[in-house]
């Protein structure tokens, strides 16, 4: 008698395990179809477009809701679960990986844009400008980055970031607006038309989570409670429970994800007004997308394979849900809950690694953004007929790397840092408006590359930290089996029937006493 076929069972198991991924892919395809049909057969007002995208807005709000508790709980528990020396080694390996891949991405982008030359055949006046240029000073932006690493108010850091703005000092004192000046300092003077302009620095707070400041605090807080022993264990247990509860909420949110993604992609297709710009900037877009494809399909998998010696594409397949989410919502921070779930449940990466590495990676590891900024800067130089020297190309490389590390994981942060890169080599900052029209699409693909780089980083750091993690496991098992190693020793005196001595830092009291101490006393 032959074996009963199990193909039906396997098919059902496959659907049960991958229904969310399949439904998300179907939602993307359906969203494109719906967007094209609605755009072609009806004229929607701006108000109608806003209402149409409402279900997608709800998805974004739900994902952003869990970012704060997830980052705080995961960072604290991840650091507290490890020895400070182990945490330092893991952190160093993660930073080296992030920096190395970012530098490789920048070099790759520059090689491609110099070879393809997408801006040589076009002129600046042939491309329509869109939007307005962000007002950014390189020095002020870098100082703001350092300031935000050390927030003065922890509660405020959960919903606001510090930002400075330059204001021209007018001869007559004319206080305007309701803005509160946090600090006022004479910044600089410039000569324009033989007139001296004086500026002052005004400190403001803008909406948005200060992720970098929270990560620094959680890192220190986790190290401290990890060294407190039993006194800090109650806090470790609390944040562990908070992390687990947050991940349960993420599972509920992901059930709604296909619906939200459908309306997100359809709403964006309906919203775009000028599709002609895609033809004009087609070669530039092809250069950026080619660089992102090479980095994500060749460079990152090759590094993973060399270090881990496993199939990188199987690992990437396990991250498919997170990559699709990043592609649709274009925010690595908002994708973080899904990235956690895929890395831990699909690829079985150690939670001590994911909780420590992923929040940091979502903040400072921006391979796709760095590549995009390098390509865009050289492209704008080509549009202006400017021949870049080796020194200027090196300047672009360094600035793009530094700016991408400082960019927050929020939509279109690349445009803000793009101004810094352009200013570093003397290119007109207003030319960033030439590429804004297509940035919404490129932003999605570079965010996907950013998330993929974070994911590969967890696998690589886990492999390199295997020995330290095993040592932590062994020491934990010893403590769990016999944490205090108490063995009563009879005192050699007349009261030996009722008294016991200190052994290994613990002590026992006479059985006739009401309370019996069985744990080590800490002095």
Curated annotation (Swiss-Prot):
Keywords per UniProt: Amino-acid transport, Cell membrane, Chloride, Endosome, Glycoprotein, Membrane, Metal-binding, Phosphoprotein, Potassium, Sodium, Symport, Synapse, Synaptosome, Transmembrane, Transmembrane helix, Transport
GO CC terms in record: apical dendrite; apical plasma membrane; asymmetric synapse; axon; axon terminus; cell periphery; cell surface; cytoplasm
PROSITE patterns, A to Z: NA_DICARBOXYL_SYMP_1, NA_DICARBOXYL_SYMP_2
A GO term, aspect molecular function: glutamate binding
Stored InterPro entries: DAACS (IPR050746), Na-dicarboxylate_symporter (IPR001991), Na-dicarboxylate_symporter_CS (IPR018107), Na:dicarbo_symporter_sf (IPR036458)
Reactions this protein catalyses: K(+)(in) + L-glutamate(out) + 3 Na(+)(out) + H(+)(out) = K(+)(out) + L-glutamate(in) + 3 Na(+)(in) + H(+)(in); K(+)(in) + L-aspartate(out) + 3 Na(+)(out) + H(+)(out) = K(+)(out) + L-aspartate(in) + 3 Na(+)(in) + H(+)(in); D-aspartate(out) + K(+)(in) + 3 Na(+)(out) + H(+)(out) = D-aspartate(in) + K(+)(out) + 3 Na(+)(in) + H(+)(in); K(+)(in) + L-cysteine(out) + 3 Na(+)(out) + H(+)(out) = K(+)(out) + L-cysteine(in) + 3 Na(+)(in) + H(+)(in)
Residues annotated to bind Na(+) 2: 363, 404-405, 407
Stretches assigned to the Extracellular side: 39-61, 115-204, 266-285, 380-392, 427-439
Superkingdom of the source species: Eukaryota
Cellular compartments annotated: Cell membrane; Apical cell membrane; Synapse, Synaptosome; Early endosome membrane
Residues of this chain annotated as glycosylated in UniProt: 128, 178, 194
Residues that coordinate or bind Na(+) 1: 98, 101-102, 361, 365, 367, 450, 454
Domain notes: Contains eight transmembrane regions plus two helical hairpins that dip into the membrane. These helical hairpin structures play an important role in the transport process. The first enters the membrane from the cytoplasmic side, the second one from the extracellular side. During the transport cycle, the regions involved in amino acid transport, and especially the helical hairpins, move vertically by about 15-18 Angstroms, alternating between exposure to the aqueous phase and reinsertion in the lipid bilayer. In contrast, the regions involved in trimerization do not move.
Function: Sodium-dependent, high-affinity amino acid transporter that mediates the uptake of L-glutamate and also L-aspartate and D-aspartate. Can also transport L-cysteine. Functions as a symporter that transports one amino acid molecule together with two or three Na(+) ions and one proton, in parallel with the counter-transport of one K(+) ion. Mediates Cl(-) flux that is not coupled to amino acid transport; this avoids the accumulation of negative charges due to aspartate and Na(+) symport. Plays an important role in L-glutamate and L-aspartate reabsorption in renal tubuli.
Protein name per the record: Excitatory amino acid transporter 3
């Amino acid at each position: 008698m032959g074996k009963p076929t199990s193909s039906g069972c396997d098919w059902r198991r496959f659907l049960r395990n991958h229904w969310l991924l399949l439904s998300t892919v179907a939602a993307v395809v359906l969203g494109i179809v719906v967007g094209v049909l609605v755009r072609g057969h009806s004229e929607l007002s701006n108000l109608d477009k806003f209402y149409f995208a409402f279900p997608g807005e709800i998805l974004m709000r739900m994902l952003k809701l869990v970012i704060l508790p997830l980052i705080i709980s995961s960072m604290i528990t991840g650091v507290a679960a490890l020895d400070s020396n182990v945490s330092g080694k893991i952190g160093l390996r993660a930073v080296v990986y992030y920096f190395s891949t970012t530098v490789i991405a920048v070099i790759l982008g520059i090689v491609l844009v110099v070879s393809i030359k997408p801006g040589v055949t076009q002129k600046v006046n042939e491309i329509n400008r869109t939007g307005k240029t962000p007002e950014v000073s390189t020095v002020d932006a870098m100082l703001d980055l350092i300031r935000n690493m050390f927030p003065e108010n922890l509660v405020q850091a959960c919903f606001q970031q510090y930002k400075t703005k330059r204001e021209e000092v007018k001869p007559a004192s004319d206080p305007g607006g309701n803005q509160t000046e946090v600090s006022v300092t004479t910044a600089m003077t410039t000569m324009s038309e033989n007139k001296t302009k004086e500026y002052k620095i005004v400190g403001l707070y803008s909406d948005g989570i200060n992720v970098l400041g929270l990560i620094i605090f959680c890192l220190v807080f986790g190290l401290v409670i990890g060294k407190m022993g039993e006194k800090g264990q109650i806090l470790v247990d609390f944040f562990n429970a908070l992390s687990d509860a947050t991940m349960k909420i993420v599972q509920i949110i992901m059930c709604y994800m296909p619906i939200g993604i459908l309306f997100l992609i359809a709403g964006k297709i309906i919203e775009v007004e000028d599709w002609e710009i895609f033809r004009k900037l087609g070669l530039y877009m092809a250069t950026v997308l080619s660089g992102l494809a090479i980095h994500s399909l060749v460079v990152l998998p090759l590094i993973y394979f060399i270090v881990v010696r496993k199939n990188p594409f199987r690992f990437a397949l396990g991250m498919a849900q997170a990559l699709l989410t990043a592609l649709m919502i274009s925010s690595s921070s908002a994708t973080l809950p899904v990235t956690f779930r895929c890395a831990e449940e699909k690829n079985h990466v150690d939670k001590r690694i994911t909780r420590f590495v992923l929040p940091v990676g979502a903040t400072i590891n921006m391979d796709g953004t760095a590549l995009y900024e390098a390509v865009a800067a050289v492209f704008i130089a080509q549009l202006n007929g400017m021949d870049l020297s080796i020194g200027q190309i090196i300047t672009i490389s360094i600035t793009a790397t530094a700016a991408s590390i400082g960019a927050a994981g929020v939509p279109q942060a690349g445009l803000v840092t793009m101004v810094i890169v352009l200013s570093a080599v003397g290119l007109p900052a207003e030319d960033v408006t030439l590429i804004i029209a297509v940035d919404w699409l490129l932003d999605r693909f570079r965010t996907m590359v950013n998330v993929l780089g974070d994911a590969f980083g967890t696998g690589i750091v886990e492999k390199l930290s295997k020995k330290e993690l095993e040592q932590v496991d062994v020491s934990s098992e010893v403590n769990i089996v016999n944490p205090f190693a108490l063995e009563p020793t009879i005192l050699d005196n007349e009261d030996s029937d009722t008294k016991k001595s200190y052994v290994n830092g613990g002590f026992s009291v006479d059985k006739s006493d009401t309370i019996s101490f069985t744990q080590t006393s800490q002095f």
